């Protein structure tokens, strides 16, 4: 990232229709606009012309670029694949809660428009194999393949912002320590109510707390760029390259983070989907990260 990009026009834009709950000290001003073409060479760039994904329960000698499990509780644990209270992250190699034959549901597909994650409602028999979850969906992470301390992270996505019960997310979590010991950045997530939620979760005060910003979403299923600029002093959230809000960087944000893309369905926050719904999708055209200028 070139220094001049971050040193021009530092005046902060107020969140566009947003609501802010920030920490005790105000964050330093961030650039109102970020243009990816001016950021220099990225540290990570994925356009999904190939989809290098696999389970990678533990770190292999040659990790896949995208990991399809969370790594919580071991390979046979529900927590290893849980996305929400109603949905489980599966892949073509998932053998079910009974560790039997492959369940046979692949939520991932690629094409000219990048990666599509499709959540599917399953029948009662399949629910048993999904630890009781009603929906089979997907999640991918860069754990083992990419992590970074500070920088600008961006995903170009088509999200079901206004589809009831849909819970897609692009987020960052630390590579070390139990969640959320060193924080979590949601950049962003949506829950089907037409809003976009940007959140920094922290335990810097010895308890789980969050700095939260809400902005309007787009219900037309168009492509948008969702980004987060993470600096030692400030975190800024960007929608199509424009700053929509910022918060102070919590003191416990000291470890490199890796990226997660997932599509949850239902749960206590978004609520259940429409009973008639059988399929929900999110599309991701590009995921890119740049380091901070030295």
List each model region and its residues.
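Bacterial N-terminal signal peptides
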Residues: 8-15
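Boundary at the C-terminal end of the N-terminal hydrophobic targeting segment
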Residues: 18-22
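GH16 jelly-roll
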Residues: 23-294
